[in-house]
Amino acid sequence: HGHYLDRHTTVPTYERLAAGALARALRAPTHAAAGADDYERVLAPLYALIDAAAARAGDGRRAPDGASVRAWRALAGERRNRWRRTALAGGFALGIAGLNRAGVGPLRAELSGDELRRAALRAMGEVVARLGVDARHVVFGHTHRTGPLPGDDRDEWALAGGATLMNAGSWVYEHVYVDRPWGNPYWPGGAVELDAGGEPRLRRLLEGADPAALTAPLAPARA
């Protein structure tokens, strides 16, 4: 699926921070991860918790934005909030530095579209190397960023061992990312077509779909 990359990405997502903290608590440092069991030891409890939380709002409506999304919007918001965003970014960078000193990192205080993509590819490349995956093509998901797409730098998707990464994207309308100027790679409906002996082919099955038909109604916040 791709969730193993949460142990390596430098983007301070909720999953990455939780994985870093749990790894410290379990004395399971990321640099020692060498097999699936090492990843599952840290990530299985985390994703069990996330799954249980998602099940609470299982009525088909999307949940209100969480803390990580609100923080991302504040830090990568519109130009009219430039001064506020600059002040927040300074505090954010200090917070990231503190987390790195505490051993939760390595993390970077960079939330641009390019960095979100590159960080995921670096992290997935690390997973492939540590698991010893011997394949020409590695198909993954989790980050919801479809690719490689026309216009992407193919070198970013190529691994040192010769494999090529391919992200199937998602089937979730990520209103936060799709609303950004660089949001098209996050458009839902990604798929990878495979056949015997052929090259995997990336498909965009919902291109041109009406956004109103893809967006779930907002669920009320729970007390």
PLM regions and their residue ranges:
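Extended recognition/assembly regions associated with phosphoester-bond processing machinery
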Residues: 2-223
